[in-house]
């Protein structure tokens, strides 16, 4: 869609268990850094894409400096600590956040605009530890990740271009 520069952050390496829901990676990518694998796959499709890779964990020390460089943030993280950290940084920096989360057969998408309701407004506190299973424990149907990612990407484009009906102030659950 021609969005300019894309920042991609992940500190993990591709694992066999990722392949059913992270189709940007191939079997030959197992053991490679996820950021490098994803960029290589995307550039193979469109060599004009520009990326800023961050092969590190997002944390309290680097979240503001990384997130401040982008107009809109798309969060597909798989843990609550990271979701809340991204939300808090976006809230502080007044950045639009498009959040996507999945587990099992379910997904949720929400667009949080500056000065509007935020992730913490809906989910004030992270769930107690071990209350909600991880993707590895609870499983994820691969097509659910694809649906969530497609809707999330569409929301990002709508927000960047100021077109269409946004999910802002509406939590989509499927």
Can you describe what each PLM-predicted range is?
Residues 1-174:
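Adenine nucleotide-associated cytosolic modules
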């Amino acid at each position: 869609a021609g969005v300019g520069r894309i920042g991609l952050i992940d500190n993990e390496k591709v694992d066999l268990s990722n392949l059913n829901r992270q189709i940007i990676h191939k079997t030959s990518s197992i053991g490679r850094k996820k950021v490098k694998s994803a960029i290589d796959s995307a550039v193979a499709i469109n060599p004009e894409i520009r990326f800023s890779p961050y092969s590190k964990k997002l944390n309290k020390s680097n979240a503001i400096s990384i997130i401040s460089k982008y107009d809109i943030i798309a969060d597909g993280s798989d843990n609550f600590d990271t979701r809340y950290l991204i939300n808090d940084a976006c809230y502080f920096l007044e950045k639009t956040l498009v959040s996507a989360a999945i587990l099992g057969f379910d997904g949720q998408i929400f667009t949080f605009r500056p000065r509007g309701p935020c992730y913490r407004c809906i989910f004030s506190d992270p769930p107690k530890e071990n209350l909600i299973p991880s993707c590895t424990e609870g499983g994820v149907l691969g097509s659910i990740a694809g649906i969530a990612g497609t809707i999330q990407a569409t929301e990002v484009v709508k927000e960047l271009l100021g077109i269409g009906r946004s999910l802002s102030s509406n939590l989509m659950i499927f």
